Amino acid sequence: MKVHPFQVPKPLHQNLIVQVDREFVFYNKLHQHAEIQLTLIVKATGKLIIGDSVHPFKDGDFFVIGSHSPHLFKNDRLDDMAHKISIFFTETTFGESFFALPDLEELQAFINASKEGFKVLGNRDAIHKAMITLPSLEKLDRFICFIQLLKNLINADKKTLTNFVYPKKIGSSQGERMRTIFDYVVTHFQNEIDLNMASSQVHMTPNAFCKFFKQHTNKTFFQFLIELRIEHACQLLNREADQLSILEISEQSGFTSISNFNRQFKKLKNVIPSRFVAQQKGIKPT
C-alpha cells in the first residue's frame, strides 16, 4: 500500500475531465495526481483525509483538492450507494498560458486558493447546479459552464483544508508507510491506539515513527488522531445527538475519559460539545 501517483483517465478529444462515481466504496487508496480536483458529494457521508487534516463530508458538500495533494474520500456506509461528481484539470489543460491571459486574471485567485484546498461554505446552489449539469454538456457549453463555476468559486466563502503543502511527489517507500498509517488509524481510531501499536504497522520504532509522521504531516501522530476522533464526534453530534448521550458519543469516538473529550473538543472547536449541538440547531445561548 502506498500513496498512489494516480493517473486520471482522460477521454479522447476532451480537455476537461468529468467523472461521475456511483459505487458503494469510493476509491479507497490515499493518492495524489497532477490535476486540481473539484468534487461535489451528491450522496454520501464520511471523512476526507487531505494533507495533514481530516474533514467530515455529507450530502451537498463541495471540495477543491490541490494539485499533488495526497487525499482520500472514505465514505461511512458501505451498504448504500455513494455518489459524487468530480472535475479534473491542470493549469495547462486549455494551453500553457490559458490561465495567464490578461482577460482571465481574476481566475488566478482560484488557482492560488486551490493549492491548500478548500471547502465551500454557505450557499452552494449555483455551484451544485453547475456540477450536476456539467456531465451532460458537450464541448463549448461545458467549457462555458466550467468557467462560470470557477468564477462562482472565487466569490464563495471558503474554509482551507490543509496548511501543509506537499512536494510534488512522495517517495514510494514513504508513501507506502503513510498509506498504511492512515488506513490503520481511520479503521481503528474508535479503539485504544498507542505508539507501539501504530509504529508496529510500519515496522518502525516509536521514536522514529514520531519523527517520520511529524515530517510528513507537520503535526504529531496524536494531534492527528485526536482531530480524527473529534471530527467523528461532530458527525455523531450532528446526526444522533437526540439518540446518544455525549458520554456515548465520546466513547464511540475513541475517548475513554469524558473530561478529556470535553477538553479536546473545546480546544479544537472553541465550544463544549453540548454548546456545539445547540449551535447546529440554531439555539442561541441564554
Please name every model-derived segment.
Residues 134, 138-179:
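Hydrophobic, aromatic-enriched interface-forming segments
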Residues 2-16, 70-131, 155-160:
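A hydrophobic/aromatic-rich effector-binding and dimerization subdomain
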Residues 189-190, 237-242:
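Short amphipathic helical patch at the helix-1/turn junction of helix-turn-helix
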Residues 225-234, 275-286:
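Short, basic, alpha-helical segments at the C-terminal edge of helix-turn-helix-like DNA-binding modules
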Residues 177-184, 229-236:
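Pre-recognition alpha-helix immediately N-terminal to the DNA-recognition helix
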Residues 158, 163-172, 184-228, 250-276:
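Basic/polar phosphate-binding segments, predominantly the helix-turn-helix DNA-binding elements
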Residues 1-61, 68-69, 260, 285:
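Generic protein-terminus/edge-of-domain signal
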